[in-house]
């Protein structure tokens, strides 16, 4: 599918509002994130003080970066999403099975329900790893995500044509080919999918 991304004035953003009194940009739902300015002072940085805009997550839930694992012919495979984001270097990047803030997952945008979300809240799925990790603090203010890996023992079905089951070796080989693998999949792969993890159970 063809995508079109064009620059528009901030005043023209649909459903986003500039609060002149507070000097921030917010979504009309009061969810997602806030664009706000910060003045920083730190003596041991390149400069001792600076101003910059930040994206600040609304609420403290953060987001979920989730991977579904399933053994195919006794070999662990991971459900990977070929996901489009407008700011991606090459538009489509390989991403975890589930990726989004709680505002996205709660469908504040009134869009489609995530096809994988329910798997993470069913009792017949085993949690392999669950850990809160931080985001890039240079641009995102105190943002965190829940890295969540689950084991699925059923038939390895695909939620849609966007998804594919890959082994850790295949993911590692794709990482070596540049920006095709997105940062969240890189992070969860290198942080949690060590040899003892993928061979367990």
Protein language model regions, located:
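NUDIX/MutT-family hydrolases
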Residues: 162-180
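Conserved small/polar residues in nucleotide/adenosyl-binding loops
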Residues: 191-197
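Compact, glycine/acidic-enriched structural inserts
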Residues: 89-125
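Extended, acidic-biased charged interface segments
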Residues: 115-165
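Core of folded catalytic or high-affinity ligand/protein-binding domains
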Residues: 43-90, 96-99
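An N-terminus-focused feature that recognizes amino-terminal "leader" regions
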Residues: 1-54
């Amino acid at each position: 599918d063809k995508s079109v991304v064009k620059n528009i004035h901030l005043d023209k953003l649909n459903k986003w509002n500039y609060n002149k009194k507070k000097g921030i940009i917010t979504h009309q739902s009061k969810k997602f994130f806030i664009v706000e300015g910060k003045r920083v002072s730190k003596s041991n940085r390149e400069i001792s003080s600076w101003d910059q805009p930040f994206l600040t997550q609304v609420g403290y839930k953060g987001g979920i970066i989730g991977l579904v694992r399933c053994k195919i012919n006794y070999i662990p495979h991971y459900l990977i999403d070929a996901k489009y984001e407008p700011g991606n270097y090459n538009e489509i990047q390989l991403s975890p099975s589930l990726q989004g803030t709680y505002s996205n997952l709660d469908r504040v945008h009134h869009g489609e329900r995530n096809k994988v979300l329910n798997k993470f809240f069913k009792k017949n799925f085993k949690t392999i790893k669950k850990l809160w990790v931080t985001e890039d603090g240079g641009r995102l203010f105190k943002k965190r995500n829940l890295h969540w890996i689950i084991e699925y023992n059923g038939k390895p079905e695909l939620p849609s044509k966007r998804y594919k089951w890959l082994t850790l070796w295949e993911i590692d080989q794709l990482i070596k080919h540049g920006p095709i693998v997105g940062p969240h999949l890189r992070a969860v792969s290198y942080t949690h999918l060590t040899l003892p993890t993928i061979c367990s159970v």
